[in-house]
């Protein structure tokens, strides 16, 4: 199995990418990794090149650049070359912690869209209080969705949750303003009617306040709604941890309490740590394309590689294609 990784993408590249790749190589004997980027910088952190190949390029896409224009103009950028490796059959999948918009553009223009899928979806795995997490799609790839798009998202998310996350008969919920069947705007009502007859375990409408309680294994929404929900959850979590830290450090007594509570607080922090869940899969493409978090450390990169390996090994893309074909959506 071969995975191409944009070694120059992310806040801590190339160090975090290289260290994460080496950790994955030690963990999985069937894995071969191509690191795409500046060879001189990559080799500063590469202590072993066992099953690791470097594809040198001096060019990269900056987060400040317009995504589509950058992908079209910078054919030799590390992210674009990683996607090209997939298109040329040199890699089974690719990963980048770089610009989300640029990776979506590279996925569409280079890797290519799966036949029958109208719009790809960006799908991270979000934490829950029980530590199991849930898959959420779409969170920004397609802000102007049609009912058929969300139907396809539900099917793709269900296949992923079962194949990669190991959840038998995953529960699929539709993000809405209430749990009653008739709730929502016209888009939500049409999607609800379609999902009732879909070949999935549809559990109905779910509200954003219940997401972290694990009300569903897969949560479906349009990209605009999903992005707002995602940012709200992230912001709330950061604010709560910040307030908690402020209170625990406010006096000598509270500092003593913090010392006693530290093991429990670390467990809580680990439960909410995105680095354990891998990256956000871009569903609807011909091959797995994974967006790692921009601030990924080496553990985050390792988790993204593990996730990508599972997608390839469990044949997620062929399975999605097969299910879609049976549903006469292709």
Swiss-Prot record:
InterPro entries: FA_synthesis, Phospholipid_synth_PlsX-like. Pathway: Lipid metabolism; phospholipid metabolism. SUPFAM superfamilies: Isocitrate/Isopropylmalate dehydrogenase-like. Pfam families: FA_synthesis. Its EC number is 2.3.1.274. Catalyzes the reversible formation of acyl-phosphate (acyl-PO(4)) from acyl-[acyl-carrier-protein] (acyl-ACP). This enzyme utilizes acyl-ACP as fatty acyl donor, but not acyl-CoA. This is Phosphate acyltransferase. Homodimer. Probably interacts with PlsY. Belongs to the PlsX family. One of its GO terms (biological process) is phospholipid biosynthetic process. It is found in: Cytoplasm. It comes from Bacillus cereus (strain B4264). The keyword Protease does not apply. GO terms for cellular component: cytoplasm. The lineage of its organism: Bacteria, Bacillati, Bacillota, Bacilli, Bacillales. It is an enzyme of class 2 (transferase). It catalyses: a fatty acyl-[ACP] + phosphate = an acyl phosphate + holo-[ACP]. GO terms for molecular function: phosphate:acyl-[acyl carrier protein] acyltransferase activity.
């Amino acid at each position: 199995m071969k995975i191409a990784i944009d070694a120059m993408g992310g806040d801590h590249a190339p160090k975090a990418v290289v260290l994460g790749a080496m950790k994955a190589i030690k963990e999985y004997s069937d894995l071969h990794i191509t690191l795409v980027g500046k060879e001189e910088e990559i080799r500063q952190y590469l202590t072993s090149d066992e099953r690791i190949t470097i594809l040198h390029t001096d060019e990269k896409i900056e987060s400040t650049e317009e995504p589509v224009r950058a992908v079209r103009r910078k054919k030799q950028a590390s992210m674009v070359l990683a996607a090209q490796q997939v298109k040329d059959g040199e890699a089974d999948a690719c990963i980048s912690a770089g610009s989300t918009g640029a990776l979506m553009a590279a996925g569409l223009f280079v890797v290519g869209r799966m036949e029958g899928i109208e719009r790809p979806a960006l799908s991270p795995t979000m934490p829950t209080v029980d530590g199991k997490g849930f898959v959420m799609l779409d969170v920004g790839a397609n802000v102007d969705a049609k009912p058929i798009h969300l139907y396809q998202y539900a099917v793709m998310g269900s296949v992923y949750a079962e194949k990669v996350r190991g959840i038998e008969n995953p529960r699929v919920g539709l993000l809405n303003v209430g749990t009653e069947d008739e709730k929502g705007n016209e888009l939500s009502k049409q999607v609800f009617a379609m999902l009732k007859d879909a070949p999935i375990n549809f559990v109905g409408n779910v509200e954003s306040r219940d997401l972290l309680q694990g009300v569903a294994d897969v949560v479906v929404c349009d990209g605009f709604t999903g992005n707002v929900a995602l940012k709200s959850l992230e912001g709330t979590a950061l604010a709560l941890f910040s307030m908690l830290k402020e209170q625990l450090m406010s006096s000598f007594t509270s500092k003593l309490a913090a010392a006693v509570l530290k093991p429990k607080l670390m467990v809580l922090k680990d439960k909410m740590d995105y680095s354990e869940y891998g990256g956000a899969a871009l569903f609807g493409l011909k091959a797995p394309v994974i967006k790692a978090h921009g601030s990924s450390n080496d553990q985050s990169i390792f988790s993204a590689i593990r996730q990508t390996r599972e997608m390839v090994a469990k044949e997620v893309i062929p399975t999605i294609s097969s299910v879609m074909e049976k549903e006469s959506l292709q």
